[in-house]
Design a protein with these regions (language model features):
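Acidic, proline/glycine-rich low-complexity IDRs
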Residues: 2-139
Length: 139
């Protein structure tokens, strides 16, 4: 049997979408970018598209309401969906001394920030007021 990640890689490579009926989610690789995405339930997705990101924002998993988009071990952006409409966004460059957080109740803005970060579109940081996150040495 194949893992979800293996199936997502295969369907991406052939240009096919994959529907997960348990999570009511369509993984559509059209117009994707190659980044690593980790969903709150542990699902590893080897790409991101605007359609997939929109679906993740429209229907976050209520049990594990977050996602991480990663370029490298200490270079990522993540969102945590709070009750109501609020979204906490955190991003890190290089290490714990470069970890920042912001909160918005505008989910479309949060989605746009994650997409612009993932596509390296300039200006995404100016959309919110970021606060440095103090993280202990063991993190």
């Amino acid at each position: 049997p194949f893992t979800t990640t293996e199936l997502l890689r295969m369907t991406r490579d052939f240009g096919f979408a994959l529907y997960d009926p348990q999570r009511l989610r369509l993984y559509d690789p059209r117009d994707h970018i190659d980044v690593d995405v980790e969903l709150g339930d542990g699902t590893q997705v080897p790409y991101l598209s605007e359609r997939l990101l929109a679906g993740l924002f429209d229907r976050p998993d209520p049990r594990w309401p977050w996602l991480i988009v990663r370029r490298a071990e200490h270079h990522y952006i993540q969102s945590i969906f709070m009750e109501g409409r609020a979204v906490v966004i955190e991003h890190r460059r290089r290490g714990p001394d470069q970890h920042f957080s912001a909160t918005t109740s505008d989910r479309q803005l949060a989605q746009r920030i994650l997409w612009n970060w993932a596509t390296q579109t300039p200006g995404w940081e100016e959309c919110l007021s970021w606060q440095r996150v103090e993280i202990g040495a063991d993190t």
